[in-house]
Amino acid sequence: DTYIVVNKGYIGENIYGGGYAGTVYNTKVEVTEEEYNQIYVGLNVFGGGKGVSATVYNTTNVLIDLKLDMEVTEEEVSTAEITSGQTKVEVEILNTYSKILGSVYGGGDLGQVGQGVINTSNNTAAISKEGTTYVEIKNGYIEGSVFGGGSGVPTVEKYELRMGTIYGSTRTIVNGGYIKGNVYGGGTQSRVYFSNKDDASIIYATNVLIEEKEEKIVINGSVFGGGDRGNSATTNASVPTTIGDVLVTIITFFSELTFMN
């Protein structure tokens, strides 16, 4: 097993819970700021490893908890500005001493979580070892997006179908913080295959009461139960796949909303 803890410091590129083309059983990555010790991550945080042959057999666990103070104001806008009944949210970030300039992934950078073989004829997978990713965002500034799955976007390698695949399930929880991009239950241009009819990927965006103080959540983009298709410039832009049921739950201080797909 591997356990990475970052409490302060400057990391110019990526953080990987797994290995570089290597294999591990479980990974745990904690990027947690203590006593306002600045943490700066120049690129991304991955629960899994780097490279198409990198594998995490069992589980990945990623926790992000950075200091962030922000003021969030919601106000009704006039009909002259926008469609009647809609609101406008103003966000003032009071400090960004610590930040992640890229995205956060439960899976790997081309690497897999769990083990299986993809059947291209019917877009299913025979799973020999089921894996699970856990991502929890407690607080902090994230410039990119949050993914329960992995990244299947090659840079110099030839594209392979298994890149960034999760053979199992994903769990993503957002308790607070500012996410400039989107939140996905799946990965980016990668696949999540589940072994039975349970949830293929689950994403929670929660706004809970902690120590008598309501934690603020701002997601500048959208929330998706599935994955990100990427852009038209990539050769594998049409591959994000989630096999199984999708449950999206948004929990606020006032109510709980559940959407089934």
Where in the sequence are the language-model features?
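Surface-exposed loop/turn motifs in large extracellular/passenger domains
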Residues: 1-14, 19-145, 150-261
